Amino acid sequence: MMKDRLILAIETSCDETSVAVLRNDAELLSNVIASQIASHQRFGGVVPEVASRHHVEVITACIEEALLEAEVTAEDLTAVAVTYGPGLVGALLVGISAAKAFAWANGLPLIPVNHMAGHLMAARAVKELEFPLLALLVSGGHTELVYVSEAGDYKIVGETRDDAVGEAYDKVGRVMGLPYPAGRVIDELAHEGQDIYDFPRAMIKEDNLEFSFSGLKSAFINLYHNAQQKGETLSNADLSASFQACVMDILMAKTKKALEQYPVKTLVVAGGVAANQGLRERLAAEITDVEVIIPPLRLCGDNAGMIALAAVSEYNKENLAGWDLNAKPSLAFENL
Protein backbone atom coordinates (compact mmCIF):
# COMPACT_ATOMS: atom_id res chain seq x y z
CA MET A 1 0.00 0.00 0.00
CA MET A 2 1.36 3.40 -1.01
CA LYS A 3 2.23 5.74 1.83
CA ASP A 4 0.18 8.94 2.06
CA ARG A 5 1.96 12.12 1.00
CA LEU A 6 1.73 14.63 3.84
CA ILE A 7 2.78 18.25 3.31
CA LEU A 8 3.15 20.73 6.16
CA ALA A 9 2.61 24.26 4.81
CA ILE A 10 3.46 27.62 6.39
CA GLU A 11 2.02 31.02 5.42
CA THR A 12 3.19 34.33 6.96
CA SER A 13 3.14 36.78 4.05
CA CYS A 14 1.09 39.48 5.78
CA ASP A 15 -0.96 39.52 8.99
CA GLU A 16 -2.07 35.90 9.37
CA THR A 17 0.15 33.20 10.81
CA SER A 18 -1.09 29.93 9.37
CA VAL A 19 0.07 26.32 9.29
CA ALA A 20 -1.72 23.44 7.53
CA VAL A 21 -1.28 19.75 6.85
CA LEU A 22 -2.42 18.32 3.51
CA ARG A 23 -2.84 14.63 2.79
CA ASN A 24 -2.20 13.59 -0.82
CA ASP A 25 -3.69 15.97 -3.41
CA ALA A 26 -6.54 17.84 -1.72
CA GLU A 27 -7.42 16.56 1.75
CA LEU A 28 -6.74 19.24 4.36
CA LEU A 29 -6.24 17.58 7.73
CA SER A 30 -5.68 20.90 9.50
CA ASN A 31 -5.51 24.61 8.68
CA VAL A 32 -4.60 26.66 11.74
CA ILE A 33 -4.91 30.44 11.38
CA ALA A 34 -3.77 32.95 14.01
CA SER A 35 -5.19 36.32 12.98
CA GLN A 36 -3.65 39.67 13.93
CA ILE A 37 -6.58 41.87 12.89
CA ALA A 38 -7.19 43.15 16.44
CA SER A 39 -3.58 44.37 16.69
CA HIS A 40 -3.73 46.31 13.40
CA GLN A 41 -7.26 47.76 13.61
CA ARG A 42 -6.26 50.84 15.61
CA PHE A 43 -3.74 51.73 12.90
CA GLY A 44 -6.28 51.31 10.08
CA GLY A 45 -4.00 48.89 8.25
CA VAL A 46 -1.20 46.37 8.62
CA VAL A 47 1.96 47.61 10.37
CA PRO A 48 4.84 45.46 9.03
CA GLU A 49 6.92 45.49 12.22
CA VAL A 50 3.92 44.53 14.36
CA ALA A 51 3.04 41.75 11.92
CA SER A 52 6.55 40.29 12.05
CA ARG A 53 6.65 40.29 15.85
CA HIS A 54 3.29 38.52 16.06
CA HIS A 55 4.48 35.85 13.61
CA VAL A 56 7.55 35.20 15.77
CA GLU A 57 5.38 34.88 18.88
CA VAL A 58 2.93 32.29 17.52
CA ILE A 59 4.60 30.37 14.67
CA THR A 60 5.88 27.49 16.84
CA ALA A 61 2.52 27.04 18.56
CA CYS A 62 0.76 27.08 15.17
CA ILE A 63 3.03 24.31 13.85
CA GLU A 64 2.38 22.21 16.95
CA GLU A 65 -1.38 22.78 16.76
CA ALA A 66 -1.53 21.94 13.04
CA LEU A 67 0.26 18.62 13.62
CA LEU A 68 -1.91 17.83 16.64
CA GLU A 69 -5.15 18.61 14.81
CA ALA A 70 -4.05 16.53 11.81
CA GLU A 71 -3.06 13.69 14.15
CA VAL A 72 0.35 13.30 12.52
CA THR A 73 3.94 13.69 13.69
CA ALA A 74 6.99 15.16 12.02
CA GLU A 75 8.11 11.62 11.18
CA ASP A 76 4.95 11.12 9.07
CA LEU A 77 5.57 14.15 6.86
CA THR A 78 6.79 14.07 3.26
CA ALA A 79 7.77 17.72 2.77
CA VAL A 80 7.48 21.27 4.09
CA ALA A 81 6.03 24.07 1.94
CA VAL A 82 6.35 27.78 2.61
CA THR A 83 5.29 31.09 1.08
CA TYR A 84 8.37 33.01 -0.07
CA GLY A 85 6.61 35.93 -1.77
CA PRO A 86 5.01 38.26 -2.53
CA GLY A 87 4.34 39.92 0.81
CA LEU A 88 5.96 41.86 3.65
CA VAL A 89 9.64 40.96 3.76
CA GLY A 90 9.90 40.70 7.55
CA ALA A 91 6.75 38.62 7.80
CA LEU A 92 7.87 36.30 5.00
CA LEU A 93 11.24 35.75 6.65
CA VAL A 94 9.62 34.48 9.85
CA GLY A 95 7.77 31.76 7.95
CA ILE A 96 10.76 30.89 5.77
CA SER A 97 13.05 30.62 8.80
CA ALA A 98 10.57 28.39 10.61
CA ALA A 99 10.07 26.20 7.54
CA LYS A 100 13.81 25.83 6.96
CA ALA A 101 14.46 24.94 10.60
CA PHE A 102 11.63 22.40 10.70
CA ALA A 103 12.59 20.82 7.38
CA TRP A 104 16.30 20.69 8.28
CA ALA A 105 15.66 19.20 11.71
CA ASN A 106 13.42 16.49 10.27
CA GLY A 107 15.29 15.76 7.04
CA LEU A 108 12.45 16.95 4.81
CA PRO A 109 12.54 18.68 1.40
CA LEU A 110 11.47 22.33 1.20
CA ILE A 111 8.87 23.50 -1.36
CA PRO A 112 8.79 27.23 -2.26
CA VAL A 113 5.29 28.55 -3.03
CA ASN A 114 4.13 31.82 -4.58
CA HIS A 115 1.44 33.35 -2.35
CA MET A 116 -0.78 34.25 -5.32
CA ALA A 117 -0.44 30.75 -6.76
CA GLY A 118 -1.74 29.65 -3.38
CA HIS A 119 -4.86 31.79 -3.75
CA LEU A 120 -5.43 30.42 -7.23
CA MET A 121 -4.88 26.77 -6.33
CA ALA A 122 -7.19 27.04 -3.32
CA ALA A 123 -9.85 26.22 -5.91
CA ARG A 124 -8.52 22.65 -5.83
CA ALA A 125 -10.38 22.27 -2.53
CA VAL A 126 -13.62 22.49 -4.54
CA LYS A 127 -12.68 20.08 -7.33
CA GLU A 128 -9.69 18.97 -9.37
CA LEU A 129 -8.92 21.70 -11.89
CA GLU A 130 -8.93 21.20 -15.64
CA PHE A 131 -6.41 23.19 -17.67
CA PRO A 132 -6.11 25.56 -19.37
CA LEU A 133 -8.08 27.95 -17.18
CA LEU A 134 -8.38 31.65 -16.46
CA ALA A 135 -8.18 33.12 -12.97
CA LEU A 136 -9.29 36.45 -11.53
CA LEU A 137 -7.20 37.07 -8.41
CA VAL A 138 -8.57 39.83 -6.19
CA SER A 139 -7.05 40.67 -2.81
CA GLY A 140 -5.72 43.49 -0.66
CA GLY A 141 -2.45 43.58 -2.56
CA HIS A 142 -3.30 42.25 -6.01
CA THR A 143 -5.83 42.46 -8.81
CA GLU A 144 -4.83 40.38 -11.79
CA LEU A 145 -6.08 38.10 -14.52
CA VAL A 146 -3.94 34.99 -14.92
CA TYR A 147 -3.92 32.41 -17.72
CA VAL A 148 -2.93 28.98 -16.43
CA SER A 149 -1.97 26.57 -19.21
CA GLU A 150 -1.18 23.77 -16.76
CA ALA A 151 -0.61 23.34 -13.03
CA GLY A 152 2.30 25.58 -12.05
CA ASP A 153 2.45 27.45 -15.38
CA TYR A 154 1.08 30.95 -14.83
CA LYS A 155 0.94 33.99 -17.12
CA ILE A 156 -0.41 37.37 -16.03
CA VAL A 157 -2.56 38.72 -18.86
CA GLY A 158 -3.94 41.77 -17.04
CA GLU A 159 -3.42 43.57 -13.74
CA THR A 160 -4.08 46.80 -11.88
CA ARG A 161 -2.02 49.84 -12.78
CA ASP A 162 -2.39 51.33 -9.31
CA ASP A 163 -4.45 50.25 -6.30
CA ALA A 164 -5.52 46.66 -5.75
CA VAL A 165 -9.26 46.24 -5.33
CA GLY A 166 -9.00 45.14 -1.69
CA GLU A 167 -6.80 48.14 -0.95
CA ALA A 168 -9.46 50.44 -2.43
CA TYR A 169 -12.10 48.86 -0.18
CA ASP A 170 -9.99 49.45 2.93
CA LYS A 171 -9.17 53.05 1.99
CA VAL A 172 -12.77 54.12 1.36
CA GLY A 173 -13.80 52.17 4.45
CA ARG A 174 -11.38 54.24 6.51
CA VAL A 175 -12.92 57.44 5.10
CA MET A 176 -16.37 56.24 6.19
CA GLY A 177 -15.05 55.36 9.64
CA LEU A 178 -15.52 51.62 9.19
CA PRO A 179 -13.34 49.07 11.03
CA TYR A 180 -10.34 47.47 9.31
CA PRO A 181 -10.53 45.38 7.20
CA ALA A 182 -13.51 47.08 5.59
CA GLY A 183 -14.37 44.73 2.72
CA ARG A 184 -16.97 42.60 4.50
CA VAL A 185 -18.68 45.62 6.11
CA ILE A 186 -18.88 47.51 2.80
CA ASP A 187 -20.31 44.41 1.13
CA GLU A 188 -23.01 44.15 3.80
CA LEU A 189 -23.81 47.88 3.62
CA ALA A 190 -23.97 47.70 -0.18
CA HIS A 191 -26.81 45.20 0.06
CA GLU A 192 -28.75 47.68 2.22
CA GLY A 193 -28.16 50.79 0.09
CA GLN A 194 -28.89 52.14 -3.39
CA ASP A 195 -26.47 52.73 -6.26
CA ILE A 196 -27.12 56.48 -6.58
CA TYR A 197 -23.64 57.97 -6.96
CA ASP A 198 -21.99 57.87 -10.38
CA PHE A 199 -18.35 57.00 -9.75
CA PRO A 200 -15.84 56.75 -12.63
CA ARG A 201 -15.31 53.31 -14.13
CA ALA A 202 -11.71 53.76 -15.25
CA MET A 203 -10.47 51.91 -18.34
CA ILE A 204 -13.69 49.90 -18.56
CA LYS A 205 -14.07 50.53 -22.30
CA GLU A 206 -10.38 50.35 -23.21
CA ASP A 207 -9.31 47.40 -25.31
CA ASN A 208 -7.00 45.84 -22.73
CA LEU A 209 -7.18 43.72 -19.59
CA GLU A 210 -5.79 46.34 -17.23
CA PHE A 211 -7.54 47.64 -14.10
CA SER A 212 -7.42 50.99 -12.32
CA PHE A 213 -9.05 51.89 -9.01
CA SER A 214 -7.18 55.04 -7.94
CA GLY A 215 -9.61 57.34 -9.77
CA LEU A 216 -12.58 55.65 -8.11
CA LYS A 217 -10.92 55.96 -4.71
CA SER A 218 -10.18 59.67 -5.26
CA ALA A 219 -13.70 60.40 -6.52
CA PHE A 220 -15.18 58.67 -3.48
CA ILE A 221 -12.96 60.58 -1.04
CA ASN A 222 -13.69 63.92 -2.76
CA LEU A 223 -17.45 63.30 -2.66
CA TYR A 224 -17.31 62.40 1.02
CA HIS A 225 -15.11 65.33 2.05
CA ASN A 226 -17.10 67.86 -0.01
CA ALA A 227 -20.29 66.71 1.70
CA GLN A 228 -18.63 67.07 5.09
CA GLN A 229 -17.54 70.63 4.29
CA LYS A 230 -21.13 71.49 3.37
CA GLY A 231 -22.43 69.93 6.56
CA GLU A 232 -24.23 67.18 4.62
CA THR A 233 -24.54 63.63 5.88
CA LEU A 234 -24.26 60.90 3.28
CA SER A 235 -25.59 57.39 3.75
CA ASN A 236 -22.78 54.87 4.20
CA ALA A 237 -25.12 52.24 2.75
CA ASP A 238 -25.69 54.24 -0.46
CA LEU A 239 -22.00 55.11 -0.70
CA SER A 240 -21.09 51.45 -0.28
CA ALA A 241 -23.66 50.32 -2.85
CA SER A 242 -22.40 52.85 -5.39
CA PHE A 243 -18.74 52.06 -4.73
CA GLN A 244 -19.28 48.31 -4.94
CA ALA A 245 -21.38 48.57 -8.12
CA CYS A 246 -18.53 50.48 -9.75
CA VAL A 247 -15.91 47.94 -8.64
CA MET A 248 -18.01 45.02 -9.84
CA ASP A 249 -18.69 46.66 -13.21
CA ILE A 250 -14.94 47.00 -13.76
CA LEU A 251 -14.10 43.47 -12.61
CA MET A 252 -16.87 41.90 -14.68
CA ALA A 253 -16.06 43.88 -17.84
CA LYS A 254 -12.38 42.93 -17.80
CA THR A 255 -13.07 39.31 -16.88
CA LYS A 256 -15.55 38.93 -19.75
CA LYS A 257 -13.03 40.48 -22.15
CA ALA A 258 -10.35 38.06 -20.93
CA LEU A 259 -12.67 35.10 -21.46
CA GLU A 260 -13.21 36.27 -25.05
CA GLN A 261 -9.46 36.42 -25.66
CA TYR A 262 -8.64 33.18 -23.83
CA PRO A 263 -11.27 30.55 -24.59
CA VAL A 264 -11.27 28.27 -21.55
CA LYS A 265 -13.85 26.11 -19.83
CA THR A 266 -13.05 27.21 -16.29
CA LEU A 267 -12.79 30.55 -14.48
CA VAL A 268 -11.27 30.53 -10.99
CA VAL A 269 -12.00 33.57 -8.81
CA ALA A 270 -9.82 33.69 -5.71
CA GLY A 271 -8.22 35.94 -3.10
CA GLY A 272 -9.68 37.73 -0.10
CA VAL A 273 -12.15 39.74 -2.20
CA ALA A 274 -13.54 36.47 -3.62
CA ALA A 275 -15.43 36.24 -0.31
CA ASN A 276 -17.45 39.30 -1.39
CA GLN A 277 -21.12 38.34 -1.77
CA GLY A 278 -21.74 41.05 -4.35
CA LEU A 279 -18.99 39.64 -6.56
CA ARG A 280 -20.33 36.11 -6.20
CA GLU A 281 -23.81 37.30 -7.18
CA ARG A 282 -22.55 39.10 -10.29
CA LEU A 283 -20.47 36.09 -11.35
CA ALA A 284 -23.44 33.74 -10.96
CA ALA A 285 -25.69 36.05 -12.97
CA GLU A 286 -23.31 37.05 -15.76
CA ILE A 287 -20.70 34.31 -16.29
CA THR A 288 -22.79 31.38 -17.48
CA ASP A 289 -20.88 29.90 -20.41
CA VAL A 290 -17.88 28.65 -18.40
CA GLU A 291 -17.62 26.90 -15.04
CA VAL A 292 -16.86 29.37 -12.24
CA ILE A 293 -14.95 27.93 -9.28
CA ILE A 294 -14.59 29.99 -6.10
CA PRO A 295 -12.80 28.56 -3.04
CA PRO A 296 -14.85 28.15 0.15
CA LEU A 297 -14.87 31.22 2.39
CA ARG A 298 -12.36 29.67 4.82
CA LEU A 299 -9.81 29.47 1.98
CA CYS A 300 -10.38 32.93 0.46
CA GLY A 301 -8.30 34.90 2.94
CA ASP A 302 -4.63 34.19 3.64
CA ASN A 303 -4.17 30.65 4.94
CA ALA A 304 -1.65 27.82 4.76
CA GLY A 305 -4.19 25.37 3.35
CA MET A 306 -4.01 27.11 -0.02
CA ILE A 307 -0.20 27.06 0.13
CA ALA A 308 -0.30 23.30 0.66
CA LEU A 309 -2.70 22.88 -2.27
CA ALA A 310 -0.37 24.90 -4.52
CA ALA A 311 2.65 22.98 -3.26
CA VAL A 312 1.38 19.71 -4.75
CA SER A 313 2.17 20.68 -8.35
CA GLU A 314 5.55 22.14 -7.31
CA TYR A 315 6.43 18.90 -5.51
CA ASN A 316 5.32 16.78 -8.46
CA LYS A 317 7.59 18.85 -10.73
CA GLU A 318 10.43 18.47 -8.18
CA ASN A 319 10.59 22.24 -7.81
CA LEU A 320 12.34 22.24 -4.44
CA ALA A 321 14.24 25.00 -2.64
CA GLY A 322 17.73 24.99 -1.21
CA TRP A 323 18.61 26.16 2.28
CA ASP A 324 19.46 29.55 0.78
CA LEU A 325 15.77 30.25 0.01
CA ASN A 326 15.09 33.93 0.66
CA ALA A 327 12.02 36.14 0.82
CA LYS A 328 10.93 37.80 -2.43
CA PRO A 329 8.47 40.52 -1.39
CA SER A 330 7.79 41.58 -5.01
CA LEU A 331 7.61 38.07 -6.46
CA ALA A 332 5.52 37.84 -9.63
CA PHE A 333 4.29 34.83 -11.58
CA GLU A 334 6.78 35.47 -14.41
CA ASN A 335 9.82 34.99 -12.19
CA LEU A 336 8.81 31.92 -10.23
UniProtKB/Swiss-Prot annotation:
<keyword id="KW-0819">tRNA processing</keyword>
<feature type="binding site">
    <location>
        <position position="183"/>
    </location>
    <ligand>
        <name>substrate</name>
    </ligand>
</feature>
<keyword id="KW-0808">Transferase</keyword>
<feature type="binding site">
    <location>
        <position position="115"/>
    </location>
    <ligand>
        <name>Fe cation</name>
    </ligand>
</feature>
<keyword id="KW-0963">Cytoplasm</keyword>
<keyword id="KW-0012">Acyltransferase</keyword>
<dbReference type="InterPro" id="IPR000905">
    <property type="entry name" value="Gcp-like_dom"/>
</dbReference>
<dbReference type="GO" id="GO:0002949">
    <property type="term" value="P:tRNA threonylcarbamoyladenosine modification"/>
</dbReference>
<dbReference type="InterPro" id="IPR043129">
    <property type="entry name" value="ATPase_NBD"/>
</dbReference>
<feature type="binding site">
    <location>
        <position position="187"/>
    </location>
    <ligand>
        <name>substrate</name>
    </ligand>
</feature>
<feature type="binding site">
    <location>
        <position position="170"/>
    </location>
    <ligand>
        <name>substrate</name>
    </ligand>
</feature>
<dbReference type="GO" id="GO:0061711">
    <property type="term" value="F:N(6)-L-threonylcarbamoyladenine synthase activity"/>
</dbReference>
<comment type="similarity">
    <text>Belongs to the KAE1 / TsaD family.</text>
</comment>
<protein>
    <recommendedName>
        <fullName>tRNA N6-adenosine threonylcarbamoyltransferase</fullName>
        <ecNumber>2.3.1.234</ecNumber>
    </recommendedName>
</protein>
<dbReference type="GO" id="GO:0005506">
    <property type="term" value="F:iron ion binding"/>
</dbReference>
<comment type="function">
    <text>Required for the formation of a threonylcarbamoyl group on adenosine at position 37 (t(6)A37) in tRNAs that read codons beginning with adenine. Is involved in the transfer of the threonylcarbamoyl moiety of threonylcarbamoyl-AMP (TC-AMP) to the N6 group of A37, together with TsaE and TsaB. TsaD likely plays a direct catalytic role in this reaction.</text>
</comment>
<feature type="binding site">
    <location>
        <position position="119"/>
    </location>
    <ligand>
        <name>Fe cation</name>
    </ligand>
</feature>
<keyword id="KW-0479">Metal-binding</keyword>
<dbReference type="Pfam" id="PF00814">
    <property type="entry name" value="TsaD"/>
</dbReference>
<dbReference type="InterPro" id="IPR022450">
    <property type="entry name" value="TsaD"/>
</dbReference>
<feature type="binding site">
    <location>
        <position position="302"/>
    </location>
    <ligand>
        <name>Fe cation</name>
    </ligand>
</feature>
<dbReference type="GO" id="GO:0005737">
    <property type="term" value="C:cytoplasm"/>
</dbReference>
<dbReference type="InterPro" id="IPR017861">
    <property type="entry name" value="KAE1/TsaD"/>
</dbReference>
<keyword id="KW-0408">Iron</keyword>
<feature type="binding site">
    <location>
        <begin position="137"/>
        <end position="141"/>
    </location>
    <ligand>
        <name>substrate</name>
    </ligand>
</feature>
<feature type="binding site">
    <location>
        <position position="276"/>
    </location>
    <ligand>
        <name>substrate</name>
    </ligand>
</feature>
